[in-house]
Each structure stands twice: as C-alpha cells, then as structure tokens.
Amino acid sequence: YCQFKMWTCDSERKCCEDMVCRLWCKLNL
C-alpha cells in the first residue's frame, strides 16, 4: 500500500504523482 510520505516507483504500485516524487524516483531507480 501507498502511505503518506512513502514514495514507491515500481510499476505495480505507483505512488509518485508530484514533481518532487518523480525526481526522487529518477534518482533512486
């Protein structure tokens, strides 16, 4: 499950919506 302040970037459970999260995902993939 996606929880507040817990960002996941895997394709099965995408939680990334805002820009900061997407940048974080790019850096952490």
Curated annotation (Swiss-Prot):
It is found in: Secreted. Keywords: Calcium-activated potassium channel impairing toxin, Disulfide bond, Ion channel impairing toxin, Neurotoxin, Potassium channel impairing toxin, Secreted, Toxin. Disulfide bonds join 2-16, 9-21, 15-25. One of its GO terms (cellular component) is extracellular region. Its main location: secreted. It comes from the Eukaryota. The keyword Secreted applies. Expressed by the venom gland. One of its GO terms (molecular function) is toxin activity. The keyword Secreted applies. Negative results: At concentrations up to 330 nM, does not show activity on transient 'A-type' Kv, delayed-rectifier Kv, voltage-gated sodium channel (Nav) and both HVA and M-LVA Cav channels in cockroach DUM neurons. The presence of a 'disulfide through disulfide knot' structurally defines this protein as a knottin. Belongs to the neurotoxin 30 (phrixotoxin) family. Both insecticidal and vertebrate neurotoxin that potently blocks insect calcium-activated potassium (BKCa) channels (Slo-type) in cockroach dorsal unpaired median (DUM) neurons (IC(50)=24.6 nM). This occurs in the absence of any shifts in the voltage dependence of activation. May interact with the turret and/or loop region of the external entrance to the channel and does not project deeply into the pore of the channel. Also shows toxicity to mice by introcerebroventicular injection. This is Lambda-theraphotoxin-Ec2c. It comes from Eucratoscelus constrictus.
